[in-house]
Amino acid sequence: VTPTTKTIADLNPHLDYNQTTTTAENRAQSLGDPRAIVFAADGNAWISGMGSNHVIRASVDGTRLARIDVGQGPTGLVLSADGGKLYVLNKFDGSISTIDTASASEAARLVFFDPTPAAIRQGRPMLYDTQASSGLGQVACASCHVDAKSDFLAWDLGNPAGTMKTFNQTCRPNQVCDDWH
């Protein structure tokens, strides 16, 4: 691969996108909601999956070389100057994982103070969890509602110029909620 060559690599080559679901083992291998990438001196890339709670190492041609489970919501990556350690910011559980790049394993996890209210801290991962909310393990509600924001799109693919579909968002127990998906 030369620097001027453009290459597109599927980060989930094990998936059959003609299917709506796969085995639990395949789903667990999926990288969901990639959020950060850092390149090592050898050209390999480290990529975090915020929705799948792991980091992968991929070669310059996109071949997956390693998968490392980390804390919830890995969003940031920093490689040490010597390339021996990869630091991963795990947003949802308020921690930093230290990855030993030689063994491709989590060597340590440091938890830090997170002032986020407990209800939000416990509920936020559900919006991003690609393993629980996707038949293939690579997308979640947050894939369309990026960073839990509203996109203000009608999502009527038959009439893109249509008006926004309104729905009852209260969905309290023992009440009928609108089917909005």
Q: PLM features: what roles do these ranges have?
A:
Residues 1-30, 110-125, 130:
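Surface-exposed loop and turn segments in beta-propeller and other repeat-based domains
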Residues 2-4, 59-63, 100-104:
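Short loop/turn segments that connect beta-strands within beta-propeller blades
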Residues 22-38, 73-74, 141-142:
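Signature of short aromatic-glycine-proline-rich micro-motifs recurring in repeat-based ectodomains
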Residues 33, 51, 73, 119, ...:
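Beta-rich catalytic cores
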Residues 42-43, 83:
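Conserved loop/turn motif of beta-propeller repeat scaffolds
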Residues 50-51, 91-92:
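Short loop/turn segments immediately following the C-termini of beta-strands
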Residues 76-79, 83-89, 104-121, 128-181:
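Electron-transfer interface patches adjacent to heme c in soluble/periplasmic c-type cytochromes
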